[in-house]
């Protein structure tokens, strides 16, 4: 960015630090078996939370990835996103029962995930798991 230009990060950062926010989901398309440059830039900028006393500590975190093929790098992408946030002292979860996967792994078929029942199921499971654990922690 040029000097004086701003983007959405300050507003997003403020929301993420809000004590009412107890769960965070981050997703990315899969590019060459990894997250997008935009997702990586977001993670890199999140270092500010760590430098400010681990402001995201103990929030529940999940990751999802959408690839152009089944087994098209989604698991690697989710793992990379997890790695970027483990250093923030977040509580990282997968999608839970019934599949018990690393996170949400979706397949974009013909510009839509609608036909990917398995992937949509992992996304629903991830959302449920983040909400479930956040509820337990914040009783």
What is the meaning of each model-derived region?
Residues 1-52, 98-139:
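N-terminal beta1-alpha1-beta2 submodule of the flavodoxin-like/Rossmannoid cofactor-binding fold
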Residues 38, 55-102, 117-118:
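Short, glycine-/small-residue-rich phosphate/pyrophosphate-handling segment
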């Amino acid at each position: 960015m040029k000097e004086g230009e701003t983007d959405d990060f300050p507003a997003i950062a403020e929301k993420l630090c809000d004590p009412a926010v107890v769960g965070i989901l981050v997703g990315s398309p899969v590019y060459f078996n990894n997250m997008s440059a935009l997702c990586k830039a977001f993670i890199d900028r999140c270092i500010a939370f760590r430098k400010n006393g681990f402001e995201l500590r103990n929030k529940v975190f999940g990751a999802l990835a959408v690839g152009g093929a089944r087994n098209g790098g989604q698991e690697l992408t989710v793992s990379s996103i997890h790695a970027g946030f483990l250093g923030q002292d977040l509580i990282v979860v997968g999608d839970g029962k019934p599949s018990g996967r690393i996170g949400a792994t979706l397949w974009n078929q013909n510009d839509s995930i609608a036909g990917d029942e398995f992937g949509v199921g992992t996304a629903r499971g991830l959302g449920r798991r983040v909400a479930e654990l956040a509820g337990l922690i914040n009783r």
